[in-house]
Amino acid sequence: MKALSKLKAEEGIWMTDVPEPEVGHNDLLIKIRKTAICGTDVHIYNWDEWSQKTIPVPMVVGHEYVGEVVGIGQEVRGFKIGDRVSGEGHITCGHCRNCRAGRTHLCRNTIGVGVNRPGCFAEYLVIPAFNAFKIPDNISDDLASIFDPFGNAVHTALSFDLVGEDVLVSGAGPIGVMAAAVAKHVGARNVVITDVNEYRLELARKMGVTRAVNVAKENLNDVMAELGMTEGFDVGLEMSGAPPAFRSMLDTMNHGGRIAMLGIPPSDMSIDWTKVIFKGLFIKGIYGREMFETWYKMAALIQSGLDLSPIITHRFGIDDFQKGFDAMRSGQSGKVVLSWD
């Protein structure tokens, strides 16, 4: 079958022909319809330090997808041939303390689809049936293909009560923009997003944020004054991993503010911890999606009117995958969707 693989320990992704995967007793075989390119896939393409330490070569990559069930393991219940599904990319062990307590998103033995085992950039994918999620009929293939990153956004945004709150989102990448849209949709008062990439800030404006701020040109304190905010932000969603953005967030949080961190900063990032202590800030680390509460909330948010369509900016057939990666690597894109039909 046709697949996109990391074939060599160097920059690039290559179109290859690989055997179709075998279906185990508890697995589903999924015929892929559409996939989306993640920032993780760009890291793998670039072959950065993280990728060199993490990715086995050769391997089929990718973990954002929608497809159709075409094969079912003999122990599987609850799925049928023809079901349209996406799937949780974190495959968990089922036997650690967190798994047994129902906190599977915190499994210490997680294996990543397209990171530690073959991924979805292929005509067919096998995953455990436990990881599959049925897509409602009124959600398009395009939107279903980005459920994985949308789940990161939903998990982060809904970590705290947002109704009537002033929310600061640092980082206007696709996940940050979707998190900002979720915050506005569920009833936040002001949703302010910051970045230095004007293309992506414009995407955030299309998604309905209160203010999209280019911090290279505007002062965040001036924006707060313009919005009538006198006590700082109630909730911070840190999506950038950029130390200056996180320090600015700490400066502008209200006392007792709550911060959810999805962005991955450098390991040696320094901050003024006195601001955390004397402001009484609560900081929560976010990884992946809650299984599967986040997935049900994702579907419900779209069904209740949340419009994510502006975040998908580029669409290509799979034979033009290089154009998709070029768009993602340029920084001048939202989500990029590849069609396998």
From Swiss-Prot:
Q: Which residues form the active site?
A: T40, H43
Keyword Repeat carried by entry = no
Major site of localization recorded for this protein: cytoplasm
Pathway field: Amino-acid degradation; L-threonine degradation via oxydo-reductase pathway; glycine from L-threonine: step 1/2
How many cofactors are bound and how?
Binds 2 Zn(2+) ions per subunit.
Could you tell me which SUPFAM superfamilies the record lists for this protein? GroES-like (SSF50129), NAD(P)-binding Rossmann-fold domains (SSF51735)
Q: What is its EC number?
A: 1.1.1.103
- Record: residues binding Zn(2+) 1: C38, H63, E64
- UniProt-listed Gene3D superfamilies: Medium-chain alcohol dehydrogenases, catalytic domain (3.90.180.10), NAD(P)-binding Rossmann-like Domain (3.40.50.720)
Subunit details: Homotetramer.
Q: What is this protein called?
A: L-threonine 3-dehydrogenase
